């Protein structure tokens, strides 16, 4: 019953962009930490990167052309997926000029750091991109050619996260809404993947379920711990994280796998919840004109009433799509989110923790 409702909701969501909003309100649950090293290869498209988290020689700068980045031979066929394949939703001849529809506070220095990290890793002969579909599957559905996982390595044997960018289910704004998160998580020692998926609510969730199945199947080669993994997402990506963590991967055509230990959700106005949902951290800005913060808070309050751990932050005045929020009142929220995730690791997802409103 609930799954049938979600499929219907997904179809509606394909027509509307939904986000979140705020005031200076927080709900807290605590946590703990880690550091980075490297992992091995799994089957899939490859290129490389080491354990330096972007500290190798700088190749690109703010004035570098996006076209040159995408065409860099070190990235092979997947360089085109660094920026949205749907051209109508972004612009910018250079890295510092990057603009993405629905997004704010795009940090050009972060963009430069990401492309240099991936370039340095690839030059170091570390695999930074994995296909999640076979050639036959791509032939049967050509849209699957525009999917895959970018891998930001942490410590070998550490837990993993899958980060899902938003884009109204019309495009994937990874350079601002998932790559930065994945890079920060890798710096903290966690293995982070950023998913490039097919636009569309249902196909996006199918791709996420397939990606998680791929990671589980290749966990030893990737060097990841599959216990209490987390799903992250902003806007449309936040819905993906909520739906797949709540319904499970099998509901979207993936393998029958354990649910995520934590969902980290930014600016998406999803309202439904149930006992099937997982511990959830959420944040949003009070100036968000796409997703209403009270809708988001009501969902977190509902989860908390069911004994599901939650943490909720509303940042005064921030609009939709602030990403990491560097230089804003939300700066550092990702540290709170990681601590929340770590708390779930410690509590083994069994302790109901009441939110604290500040």
Question: Where does each model-flagged region fall?
Answer:
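N-terminal targeting or regulatory segments adjacent to alpha/beta-hydrolase or S9 domains
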Residues: 19-146, 355-358
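A short loop-to-beta-strand scaffold at the N-terminal edge of the catalytic core in hydrolase folds
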Residues: 141-153, 159-160
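Short beta-strand element of the alpha/beta-hydrolase
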Residues: 158-167
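Short beta-strand/loop motif that positions the catalytic acidic residue
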Residues: 282-284
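Primarily recognizes the serine-hydrolase "nucleophile elbow" in alpha/beta-hydrolase
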Residues: 206, 210-277
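Short amphipathic alpha-helix adjacent to the substrate-entry channel of hydrolases
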Residues: 175-193
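Conserved alpha/beta-hydrolase "acid-adjacent" motif
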Residues: 289-295
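C-terminal catalytic histidine-bearing segment of alpha/beta-hydrolase fold enzymes
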Residues: 44, 49-64, 306-358
């Amino acid at each position: 019953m609930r799954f049938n409702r979600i499929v219907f909701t997904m179809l509606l969501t394909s027509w509307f962009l939904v986000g979140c909003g705020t005031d200076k309100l927080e709900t807290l649950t605590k946590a703990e930490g880690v550091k980075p090293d490297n992992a091995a290869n799994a089957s899939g498209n490859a290129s490389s990167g080491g354990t330096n988290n972007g500290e190798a020689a700088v190749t690109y700068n703010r004035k570098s052309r996006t076209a040159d980045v995408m065409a860099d031979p070190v990235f092979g066929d997947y360089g085109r997926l660094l920026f949205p394949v749907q051209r109508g939703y972004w612009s910018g001849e250079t890295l510092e000029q990057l603009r993405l529809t629905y997004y704010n506070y795009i940090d050009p220095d972060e963009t430069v750091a990401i492309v240099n990290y991936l370039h340095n890793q690839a030059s170091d002969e570390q695999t930074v991109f994995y296909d999640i579909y076979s050639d036959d599957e791509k032939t049967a559905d050509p849209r699957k050619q525009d999917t895959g996982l970018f891998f930001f390595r942490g410590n070998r044997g550490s837990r993993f996260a899958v980060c899902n960018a938003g884009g109204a289910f019309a495009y994937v704004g990874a350079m601002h809404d998932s790559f930065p998160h994945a890079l920060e998580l890798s710096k903290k020692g966690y293995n982070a993947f950023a998913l490039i998926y097919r636009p569309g609510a249902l196909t996006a969730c199918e791709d996420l379920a397939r990606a998680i199945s791929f990671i589980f199947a290749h966990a030893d080669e990737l060097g990841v711990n599959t216990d209490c993994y987390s799903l992250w997402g902003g806007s449309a990506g936040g819905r993906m994280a909520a739906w797949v963590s709540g319904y499970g991967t099998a509901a979207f055509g993936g393998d029958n796998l354990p649910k995520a230990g934590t969902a980290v959700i930014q600016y998406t106005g999803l309202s439904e919840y149930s006992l099937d949902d997982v511990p959830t951290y959420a944040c949003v800005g009070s100036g968000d004109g796409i997703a209403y913060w009270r809708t988001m808070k009501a969902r977190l309050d509902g989860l908390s009433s069911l004994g599901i751990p939650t943490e909720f932050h509303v940042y005064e005045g921030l609009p939709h799509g602030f990403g990491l929020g560097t230089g804003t009142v939300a700066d550092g929220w990702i540290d709170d989110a990681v601590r929340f995730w770590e708390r779930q690791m410690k509590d083994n997802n069994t302790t109901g923790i009441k939110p604290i409103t500040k």
